[in-house]
Amino acid sequence: MTKRALISVSDKSGIIDFAKELKNLGWDIISTGGTKVALDNAGVETIAIDDVTGFPEMMDGRVKTLHPNIHGGLLARRDVDSHLQAAKDNNIELIDLVVINLYPFKETILRPDVTYDLAVENIDIGGPSMLRSAAKNHASVTVVVDPADYATVLGELADAGQTTFETRQRLAAKVFRHTAAYDALIAEYFTAQVGEAKPEKLTITYDLKQAMRYGENPQQDADFYQKALPTDYSIASAKQLNGKELSFNNIRDADAAIRIIRDFKDRPTVIALKHMNPCGIGQADDIETAWDYAYEADPVSIFGGIVVLNREVDAATAKKMHPIFLEIIIAPSYSEEALAILTNKKKNLRILELPFDAQAASEVEAEYTGVVGGLLVQNQDVVAENPSDWQVVTDRQPTEQEATALEFAWKAIKYVKSNGIIITNDHMTLGLGAGQTNRVGSVKIAIEQAKDHLDGAVLASDAFFPFADNIEEVAAAGVKAIIQPGGSVRDQDSIDAANKHGLTMIFTGVRHFRH
């Protein structure tokens, strides 16, 4: 009995050669619509789908394959006599191979001019139904959804006249992943259209971006996935201009870096980062000076770190960066001379280019945190804050220079691991205490790091001070200005201590924990 294949593809890459090889192997080919036209024009003889169903395509192609003659031919078990008899009694011919890819729903909704009606029309119904029928019956039917699998299937058919069960099972698993992702994307689109903020089912889909050598540690397996609807301002979308493949830790650190830099749009800024904590932030009127400040902030910790710049990297800045061992540099662009300098004898230095004009769209994405057996979902900490809403709670008002420095410090503290303390002036970080289990411990670390630069410095805390001992430490170090959220039941104790030492202190009313 001649074996039959059903081919209906929107992505026609490789399909002509595939179909010709099938014909050479003696297969009959059933086809639909544009695929049939393409095959016929290439000289590949095909059977029209309506010759199999006995019904014409109708309703603008919405109904063409949803028919017992198709699904019976796919679902009939070859090892069950009653199935084969039912097929014979109803003149249903078996289908042994299905090659289908789906309407381009993803590509459609990514179009800037897409309409709701156009998106709906690009939801495939018949394709997923046939794929699922064939995949369910993979004991007998080979199902192909990816042109990358054409060669494997043809090779096995040529060698043995059929594919192996292992191949059919692998391809069936691929199909179920494919249709699940396709439906998840549709669900995501409709959920956004109706504005459902807390859906009872969370369906999101990601595509494999990179198979990684290992994870956070060598004993951990890891892979990098990118959202099916990619975000332009993302490490997954960054253009790599030089260097080795990004590691798991590189990606996490780089992601933290591009999140931090979003808050420093107004002036040229350079941020150095290590283990997802900023170790140096510098702002200036030009990017070269901003680099000087970021480097000076902590010339030890920057070694082996990541640097992100929010302006084009010029030759002067590149010359200063080149001698420093860095893992990654990220910027919106690089001058030709700067790129030549940075890559000279630095084949491993990872240099990434990222469209900073797409930052705003990245801020609306939800954050996902995996826990054992569950997933936490939250908005990003991108609340708009206006310094005019802040409250000076001490007798002394901040000077103009202190006010500028406090605003800078408040931007920087948001990305320090809790309990987080940062000491800055008005253009660079000076000391950082991160990740301590008590706040006064973070205060002491930040002071120790900044001890030679405390004149005119200010201090920011990501959460309230629970006790006045923190204020005493700050005052003893010579820091004169503090910014913190407030909100402790002992706030008045801290205010009294600040007044006693002539400090100025601002309450913002907004906490910035980061775990």
Swiss-Prot record:
Please verify whether the record's keywords include Mitochondrion: no
| EC numbers | 2.1.2.3, 3.5.4.10
Q: What biological-process GO terms show up in the record? A: 'de novo' IMP biosynthetic process
Pathway per its UniProt entry is: Purine metabolism; IMP biosynthesis via de novo pathway; 5-formamido-1-(5-phospho-D-ribosyl)imidazole-4-carboxamide from 5-amino-1-(5-phospho-D-ribosyl)imidazole-4-carboxamide (10-formyl THF route): step 1/1; Purine metabolism; IMP biosynthesis via de novo pathway; IMP from 5-formamido-1-(5-phospho-D-ribosyl)imidazole-4-carboxamide: step 1/1
State whether keyword Transferase applies. Answer: yes
> Which residue numbers delimit the MGS-like domain?
1-145
Listed InterPro entries = AICAR_Tfase_dup_dom_sf, Cytidine_deaminase-like, MGS-like_dom, MGS-like_dom_sf, PurH-like
Which SMART domains does the annotation name? AICARFT_IMPCHas, MGS
A Pfam family for this UniProt protein?
A: AICARFT_IMPCHas
- Which Gene Ontology cellular component terms are annotated? cytosol
GO MF entries = IMP cyclohydrolase activity; phosphoribosylaminoimidazolecarboxamide formyltransferase activity
Its domain description in UniProt is:
The IMP cyclohydrolase activity resides in the N-terminal region.
Q: Which NCBIfam families match?
A: PRK00881.1 (NF002049), purH (TIGR00355)
Instruction: List the protein's name.
Output: Bifunctional purine biosynthesis protein PurH
The scientific name of the source species is Streptococcus pyogenes serotype M4 (strain MGAS10750)
Native organism taxonomy? Bacteria, Bacillati, Bacillota, Bacilli, Lactobacillales
